[in-house]
Amino acid sequence: MKASSLADFAIPINPDARLCVFRLKEQAFVNQRFIRLTLREPPHTDAELVHALLNSTLGMFLIEAAGFGRGLGVLDLNATKLSKTFHMLNPDRPDAAAAARIKAYFRPLLARSIRELPKEIACPDRLDFDSCIAEVYGFVGLEQGIREGAEFLYKIRKSAKD
């Protein structure tokens, strides 16, 4: 494998009830069960901030929207499609103080287990984290709609096993 195949982050290609993006401690190869994400401009890009943004409820909504339900209710993600269509919040937009606030609100989520998506997006620490992101990026008041959209897509996907 080429060094250009190293990942900074990984997303399972078939996540089930728990949806998240993993951050690797250092760049590494990932196997075929994961989609690799690589920072475009390391070391200038804040990997901790990118990790937080990818794991926001908006990030989870965008991941859910990029895939489709496959048997047993798992999400089927395609690396090629994701590389061409996936978007995320711009990590260069927040100033240093705002980026530090986002990361501070994200740390409690890292300190606990990930819950199933409907329970996860209702957790008080996640609500605070998402509110911080909405404030920094200027979409205050839209958080509930984003949560509802993420949960709606999740329920459609999970209904595939019923």
Q: Where do the model's predicted regions map?
A:
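Non-catalytic DNA-recognition/assembly elements of restriction-modification systems
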Residues: 90-162
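Polybasic, glycine- and aromatic-enriched phosphate-binding surface used to engage nucleic acids
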Residues: 1-100, 104
